[in-house]
């Protein structure tokens, strides 16, 4: 399967926060933020996170990255797929197909 055709949704047990000029993801466990697993996002990570909505395919987000950050499509794809792999590994996102 073409990885760029996948769609993801955010795990409801992860909170996104902007603090000053920094963006973070905090997993919630037992109704408490698990501060040992805070994930800091750079500008590209924040941009991607804000566009994960359960509807957009990764190819759509890749195109947005190319437009927003003036990078070439292969570089945008590489960065996007690496970030998505990191988020999946930490269970911060779920493939939409996995919900069905």
Q: Can you name each region flagged by the protein language model?
A:
Residues 37-100:
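Long, charge-rich, low-complexity alpha-helical segments
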